[in-house]
Design a protein with these regions (language model features):
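N-terminal targeting sequences that direct proteins away from the cytosol to non-cytosolic compartments
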Residues: 1-147
Length: 147
């Protein structure tokens, strides 16, 4: 499936480049794992798509926090590659929105773990700004600060 029409559709959809960059950089990194390898640590990824070849329970399901937190898992079941490709196409906008929101929430969580609490910007410029402690001041003049 990974080298066929379904795999190409997945790669084309999820590895679409960011707009506006001077070079192509895919929105998401993809890792294809065989079912025998998909256990333990592999299940702790934030965003997972599982394809099941089966005639029962066909369709698309989106599950939050199935094996880890935060996590979005898409379960796509179909009797063959064409049916799974159909379910993927029918639901890819929902899947992309869910993954994007999951990534946004995780980035915010990570950024707010260690915030810069320097009151200098509030004292000097009268603004209150929140940014990660990992950011540093590049240039600091009388009326300008570049972080």
């Amino acid at each position: 499936m990974w080298e066929g029409k379904l795999g190409n559709n997945i790669k084309e959809t999820l590895m679409e480049p960011y707009e506006g960059l001077p070079f192509d950089e895919p929105k998401y990194d993809l890792y294809h794992l065989q079912p025998s390898i998909f256990k333990g640590f592999a299940r702790s990824s934030r965003n997972i798509i599982v394809f099941n070849k089966d005639t029962l329970g066909q369709g698309f399901r989106l599950i939050k926090n199935l094996w880890a937190r935060p996590q979005v898992t898409a379960l796509i079941t179909g009797e063959d590659e064409d049916v799974m490709n159909f379910y993927f196409d029918e639901n890819k906008d929902l899947l992309l929105r869910s993954i994007s929101e999951n990534e946004r929430v995780e980035k915010i969580r990570r950024m707010t773990k260690s915030l810069n609490d320097d009151p200098q910007l509030k004292d000097r410029f009268g603004i209150n700004i929140t940014f990660p402690d990992a950011y540093s001041t590049v240039k600091d003049t009388t009326n300008f600060v570049w972080i």
